[in-house]
């Protein structure tokens, strides 16, 4: 076994099951958007983490990213702090969009969704479960804190 083969074998062994070694940014973003759509109509459950019994907003984003081979923290405020800020004009499908639902007009993040393009995002809300909304909806727009991207996107 050559040194290169041995190193490759070690690297592959260290990857989580189902991971691809060389995934392009476009492929990763595409996976995030595709996975996002598979959870539409999942019920909302605060603190919930399973699509059959219900999940909250940050469990939804964590699970979507996980299924796309990416790791996010469990809580929306931690997801916010571990991602990179974007100018609104730079947002792309697969990016995260953060809100201050309980304290509009502040930067106290307590809600997160995934931008899917053309002004729309998918999120888990108390009233509708996982569904699509418009960023320009006055209710959400007034509570928008930031759009952010996963490091490497």
Identify the function of each model-found stretch.
Residues 1-7:
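Bacterial N-terminal signal peptides that target proteins for export
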Residues 9-16:
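Bacterial N-terminal signal peptides
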Residues 18-22:
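Sec/Tat signal peptide C-region and signal peptidase I cleavage site
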Residues 23-34, 42, 49, 70, ...:
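Aromatic- and glycine-rich peptidoglycan recognition patches
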Residues 36, 42-74:
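Secreted/periplasmic proteins that engage bacterial cell-wall peptidoglycan
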Residues 78-86:
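Short alpha-helix capping/helix-loop boundary micro-motifs
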């Amino acid at each position: 076994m050559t040194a290169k083969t041995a190193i490759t074998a070690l690297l592959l062994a260290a990857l989580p099951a189902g991971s691809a070694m060389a995934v392009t940014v476009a492929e990763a973003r595409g996976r995030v958007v595709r996975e996002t759509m598979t959870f539409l109509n999942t019920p909302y459950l605060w603190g919930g983490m399973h699509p059959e019994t219900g999940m909250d907003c940050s469990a939804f984003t964590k699970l979507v990213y996980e299924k796309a081979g990416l790791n996010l923290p469990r809580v929306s405020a931690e997801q916010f702090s571990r991602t990179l800020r974007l100018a609104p004009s730079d947002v792309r499908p697969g990016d995260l969009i953060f809100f201050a639902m309980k304290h509009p007009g502040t930067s106290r993040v307590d809600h997160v969704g995934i931008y899917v393009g053309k002004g729309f995002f998918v999120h888990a809300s108390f009233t509708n479960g996982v569904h699509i909304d418009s960023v320009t909806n006055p209710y959400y727009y007034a509570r928008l804190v930031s759009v952010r991207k996963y490091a490497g996107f």
